[in-house]
UniProtKB/Swiss-Prot annotation:
GO terms of biological process kind: L-histidine biosynthetic process; methionine biosynthetic process; purine nucleotide biosynthetic process; tetrahydrofolate interconversion
Protein's name according to its UniProt entry: Bifunctional protein FolD
Keyword Secreted (UniProt): no
The organism's taxonomic lineage, starting at the top: Bacteria, Pseudomonadati, Bacteroidota, Bacteroidia, Bacteroidales
Organism: Parabacteroides distasonis (strain ATCC 8503 / DSM 20701 / CIP 104284 / JCM 5825 / NCTC 11152)
Function description: Catalyzes the oxidation of 5,10-methylenetetrahydrofolate to 5,10-methenyltetrahydrofolate and then the hydrolysis of 5,10-methenyltetrahydrofolate to 10-formyltetrahydrofolate.
Single annotated GO MF: methenyltetrahydrofolate cyclohydrolase activity
Length: 298
């Protein structure tokens, strides 16, 4: 048995620590007679993944001491009705931040809904104003998954300056913001960034030259052992629900990295589950706290 020389980037442990820090801060706000941060979430329909995420967000709010409101609509809600609710939350002074859980049903334009959210309450960081401010390095709400990954790298003191970072995936939610953040002029950042996607040629060569690989493709076990150099840092954003006869729920979460092959070559790697997932939720909570304190937008 060769000795394990990689270290886990333990999102579960880090998020628990951050939860504790935030709960203490909320207790202080409360003791001083300040306003308790309030997060609202809109959930449309009954998508299994969305139900799980939203339940987890509400539970974390309670654990930290935030106020939370869950607003449910049926699958057949009209776009107009949804936009009216968004407008109502925009104008509710008690709500500091809110999210609309994606994906939305086909008959509703996600972009239209995102753009209707007041960017000062857009704690998901999806509004074009927040995305734009992020890309030019201004204070903003950074979307939760990229923000969570940065915090994870920071708390493990991962060296990033001058390193080659390969981002696999170019989605607006993870790939693009991740690439932007990894090349910003601050820590963690200052990387040389390559973005690869389904149309990329020499993908294996790119990965083999990477010091840091952030995998956000949604393709289970895509990154294999022969694509990774010794000592690389691997961040696995993938969470695909795969059928499983072993688990109680009948499915297991599978990452985009073939863990057993890749881990032995790494210096650091995130597990799935327990890596990026918990960091995403805790980063949404941090954005809510910042919104409550008016720390980014007055």
């Amino acid at each position: 048995m060769e000795e394990q020389h990689y270290q886990l980037l333990d999102g579960k442990a880090v998020s628990a620590q951050m939860k504790k820090e935030m709960a203490e801060e909320v207790a202080q706000i409360k003791a001083a007679g300040g306003k308790i941060p309030h997060l609202a979430a809109i959930l449309v329909g009954h998508d299994g993944g969305s139900e799980t995420y939203v339940a987890s967000k509400v539970k974390t709010c309670q654990e930290i001491g935030f106020k939370s409101t869950l607003i449910r609509f049926e699958e057949d809600v009209t776009e107009e009705e949804l936009l009216r609710k968004v407008d109502e939350l925009n104008n509710d002074p008690d709500v500091d931040g809110f999210i609309v859980q994606l994906p939305l049903p086909k008959h509703i334009s996600e972009q239209k809904v995102i753009e209707a959210i007041d960017y000062r309450k857009d704690v998901d960081g999806f509004h074009p104003i927040n995305v734009g401010r992020m890309s030019i390095g201004l204070p903003c709400f950074v979307s939760a998954t990229p923000a969570g990954i940065l915090e994870l790298l920071k708390r493990y003191h991962i060296e990033t300056q001058g390193k080659h970072c390969v981002v696999l995936g170019r989605s607006n939610i993870v790939g693009k913001p991740m690439a932007t953040l990894m090349m910003q002029k601050s820590y963690p950042g200052d990387c040389t960034v390559t973005v690869c996607h389904s149309r990329s040629k020499n993908l294996k060569e790119m990965c083999l030259s990477a010091d840091i690989i952030i995998v956000a493709l949604g393709v289970p076990e895509f990154l294999k052992g022969d694509m990774v150099k010794e000592g690389a840092v691997i961040v696995d954003v993938g969470t695909t629900r795969m059928p499983s006869s072993i688990t109680k729920s009948g499915f297991k979460l599978t990452g985009d990295v073939l863990f057993n092959e890749v881990a032995p070559k790494c210096s650091y790697i995130t597990p799935v589950p327990g890596g990026v997932g918990p960091m995403t939720i805790i980063s949404l909570m941090r954005n809510t706290l910042l919104a409550g304190k008016k720390a980014i937008y007055k």
